[in-house]
């Protein structure tokens, strides 16, 4: 739940058109972690001592997160209004910025009715399927990249761990650039679909080619699925006007998405060495799920925006003023980001 929880938290502080880059920076940390994680694991596995290498690895990778979690509990504010590092005027500005999109509304606490409303909102489910497809790859690729490289037949274990880093360095750059551009043009779907398509091409190369250079190039392409992950999380935060409804949508996203690793971590059995074609084709199919669902979500939101435009025209084109809390979303000047 930590992955979807951070974008939800960021949505409390930033307007919709600035959320992509912030979420992208957060997710890019996963790419950087994978860039050095394999080398770190290999180095620790060679350590000699009274404590088993796997125990040392758990300590080295787990203790910093646990300590920072304690620090975050006391230091991270619940909302702009409770940020102790801001004075009263700065808090008011931060709240105004986070609610700048017409239709976005601040609510007091979790509203169960709105959370349940997200279950009935058809726009909550395509992102969950996209997140599932991404997590099939997101969970399996970092685990098996060193093995895939070593099975190419031209590299030692040390070289394989070292060669695992460049694809993720490129991925880190791609996440940040794509998130920045997504904010600039105020679009999410095309970047999600584009990242998944590039990753699908990479998996096709890995499944069909035997040349070492081509397969290694395919890894660079396959890691671009991380771009889609970052912007799917952003898109969910952009699609709902209240914190409670966003929370419900993120719960749906996490529930569907976390089924992906169940499949992803079992698609590269040793019996499929050296090319792991079955796993590559399954991962390619998962990327295509993201492509199809991304296009479908764009269509649904485009259609919803047209409906909202017609409602606005019937009401005289007035997009100003506050609407009563009980009215539906068609009655508020809210427009979906495609």
Question: PLM features: what roles do these ranges have?
Answer:
Residues 1-14, 227-242, 250:
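Intracellular juxtamembrane helix-capping segments at the cytosolic ends
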Residues 208-217:
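Helix-loop junctions at membrane interfaces in 12-TM secondary transporters
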Residues 113-180, 233, 264-265:
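Extracytoplasmic gate region of multi-pass secondary transporters
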Residues 18-53, 58-65, 250-264:
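Glycine-rich segments within core transmembrane alpha-helices of 12-TM secondary carriers
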Residues 73-107, 246, 275-338:
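Intracellular terminal tails of multi-pass secondary transporters
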Residues 189-205, 228:
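Structural signature of the two symmetry-related core transmembrane helices
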Residues 243-275, 282, 286:
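A late C-terminal transmembrane helix in Major Facilitator Superfamily
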Residues 40-49, 149-150, 181-183, 267-275:
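Interfacial helix-cap and linker-helix signal at transmembrane-aqueous boundaries
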């Amino acid at each position: 739940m930590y992955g979807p929880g951070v974008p939800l938290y960021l949505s409390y502080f930033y307007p919709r058109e600035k959320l992509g880059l912030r979420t992208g920076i957060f997710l890019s940390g996963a790419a950087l972690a994978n860039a050095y994680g394999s080398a770190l694991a290999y180095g620790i596995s060679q350590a000699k001592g009274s404590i088993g290498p796997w125990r040392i690895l758990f300590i080295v990778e787990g203790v910093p997160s646990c300590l920072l979690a304690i620090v975050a509990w006391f230091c991270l504010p619940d909302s702009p209004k409770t940020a102790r590092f801001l004075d009263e005027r700065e808090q008011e500005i931060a709240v105004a910025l986070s609610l700048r999109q017409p239709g976005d509304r601040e609510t007091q606490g979790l509203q169960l009715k709105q959370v349940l409303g997200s279950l009935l909102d058809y726009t909550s489910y395509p992102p969950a399927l996209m997140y599932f497809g991404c997590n099939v790859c997101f969970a399996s690729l970092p685990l098996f990249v060193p093995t895939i490289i070593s099975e190419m037949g031209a590299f030692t274990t040390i070289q394989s761990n070292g060669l695992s880093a460049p694809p993720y360095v490129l991925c880190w750059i791609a996440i940040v650039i794509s998130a920045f551009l997504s904010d600039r043009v105020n679009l999410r779907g095309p970047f999600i679909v584009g990242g998944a398509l590039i990753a699908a091409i990479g998996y096709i190369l890995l499944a069909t080619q035997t040349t070492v250079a081509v397969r290694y190039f395919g890894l660079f392409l396959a890691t671009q699925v991380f771009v889609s992950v970052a912007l799917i999380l952003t898109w969910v935060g952009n699609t709902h006007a209240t914190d409670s409804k966003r929370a419900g949508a993120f719960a749906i996203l996490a529930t569907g998405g976390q089924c992906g690793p169940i499949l992803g971590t079992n698609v590269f059995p040793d019996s499929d060495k050296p090319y792991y074609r079955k796993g590559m084709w399954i991962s390619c199919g998962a990327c295509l799920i993201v492509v199809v669902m991304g296009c479908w979500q764009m269509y649904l939101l485009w259609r919803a925006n047209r409906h909202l435009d017609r409602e606005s025209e019937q009401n005289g084109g007035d997009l100003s003023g506050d609407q009563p809390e009980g009215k539906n979303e068609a009655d508020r000047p809210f427009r979906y980001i495609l």
